[in-house]
Amino acid sequence: MPSLVGSEMCIRDSLYTVSAVLTAKEKELDRAEKRVGLRTIELNRERDPYGMNFQFRLNGVPLFIKGSNLIPPDSFITRFDDKKLEALLDAAQFANLNMLRVWGGGYYASDAFYDACDRRGLLVWQDFGFACQAYPFFLPEFLENVKTEVHAQVQRLCHHPSLAVWCGNNEIEDMHMAWVHMQKYVQWTEKFFYEILEPEIRVEDPDTPYTPGSPVGIAHNEGVYSDNVGDTHLWGVWHGLQPMQYYRKRMTRFCSEFGFESLPDAKAIRQYAKPGDYALNSPVFNLHQKCASGNDKMVYYIASRFHLPRRFWDYIYLSQVTQDTCIADATEHWRRHKGQCNGAMYWQFNDCWGVCSWSSLDYYGNYKALQYGARRFNAPLSVSVEDSKERFDVYVLNDLNARQTVTVEYELFDFVTGTLEKEKKKLLLPPVENAVAFSREMAPLRKKYDLRRTGLAVRLVQNGACLQQKTVLFDQEKRLQLPGAKLHTKVEIQKDQLCLTVTTDRFARLVHLESSRTSLPFSDNYFDLLPGQSHTVTLAADPDCTLRELAESIRVKSLSDVPFDRDPLHAAAKRIKVYLSPVNIGNAIHHGKLSKDIEL
């Protein structure tokens, strides 16, 4: 009996080789082979109590999509070889992604890409090559050329079990408001994506789901900005300068784009900048930033949470942890409301050159904080906290199609002395269902403890092993009494890796390990340690240096090692200046508004 292709796991054993041989008079003339997998994939767009669904089902099982948007991995296509492809998809698996969106503003990926996604169980959202502008579909020659392209790509890719959906375009409907004097383009955009394209696809591929564009509503230009139908691109945070908690106000059915910029790794910056360029608004840094006011926006958001750092290099660290916090908060919010929301695909996964951007993986292969964070917040079995000024609720999130028995521990701790109170509970989770383990009111805690020096730690334990620890603080770091933490790192050289055990005396916020000798990832990074706690991290050997050299290159720090400018007026002045720039005011008006649900 053939095995069905699944997700959340490697599917190598579920792939089969199909061969076709052309013969004449018992002589072989030609042969073709393809690797295929058996599965059903559906995109459920039916009405439900929340509006109109946008939910993928794999073999009949609802999926919460944890994905990212893939841009061209290099500005020069031929520089992207098979080794880089494997590293790229290794990073996607490390981040616990189950879908990559091949963005329509780039180019169609190679056969090797789709083969590798098939092997890894990574689903692919495939945009056609139309994005962000008007196309002259009304010209017969152009339309016939487009149809030829569509048939060629569909025929090439439709056998891949990783292919989950054909998407007509990226954000073209979103651009229509600027096409006042281009009504012919508007009319033909609707005609092509809503009437012409899908029948052309069905000639080659009768089964794979199709959606006219992203974002999409219920019809052309109907509900494109609505949360209760279709998929959404949410840019209230970042472009709209909304606070990072803004996403908790949005109960979208499926968020296929949302993002936040950060600086790349220091090793990446040294590839394109010299010491005299190390300033966020230097000519070189402005050149390597393609978002208007992007570097200033990073400062704007860093200052909302931290004091501003005195050293340039600490902007890398703080921009990356701020990016991770933003994407994690949104993804966990939507995962907690699985069923109403069915997917979170952050923008963007990778870079095509050395740049400050929305990516979790920089051009040179260095993992940003978001890569490590995604491994945690996208884990198929994970813990999440929904917190407010009034209460907090501890959730266990289960995306696995099997019952899970887990123990959830919650601990209130003092930043210096450690445990204040602790409780644990055993839970039996049904397949692909979430559960609330604890709910607590904040008022009694405020009376009992000084919350400026108190944190909440939640642990998820299964079969005696701690799968995950999550820390929640009750205010922004700049308002808390975070102590100076002394970190001790023990480095052990093993056969093919380093083992690093980090221990702290007091609460250590956002412990960061880095190496100047390798871009290979640590097994974990940017984590918190409670007073007296230790955590062991591994780093694989790099063929370009010895393990001894690698060990000597390791540097460890936490938030308490960052020297800050603690002048609140300085930070406030910077935030006001960023907000009042004309481009940011316009974006704030456009992107900051809450959606209005469309009536069905």
Predicted feature descriptions by range:
Residues R12-L15, A20-A32, S439-P483, D542-I598:
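Terminal connector regions
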Residues W166, P199-R202, T211-S214, I218-V229, ...:
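Substrate-binding clefts and catalytic carboxylate motifs of secreted carbohydrate-active enzymes
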Residues N434-F438, N525-F527, Q533-V537:
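Short strand-edge motifs at loop-to-beta-strand transitions and within beta-strands
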Residues S19, K27-Q133, L143-V165, N286-D324:
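Active-site-adjacent substrate/metal-binding segments within catalytic domains
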Residues Y50-Q55, R375-V408, E477-T504:
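Surface beta-strand/loop "capping" patches
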Residues M1-G6, I11:
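Single conserved hydrophobic/aromatic residue that forms the stacking wall/gate
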Residues M1, F392-L429, N434-S439, T454-V461, ...:
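Beta-strand-rich binding/interaction modules
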Residues R119, P136-G223, T325, Y364-G365:
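Active-site neighborhood of glycoside hydrolase catalytic domains
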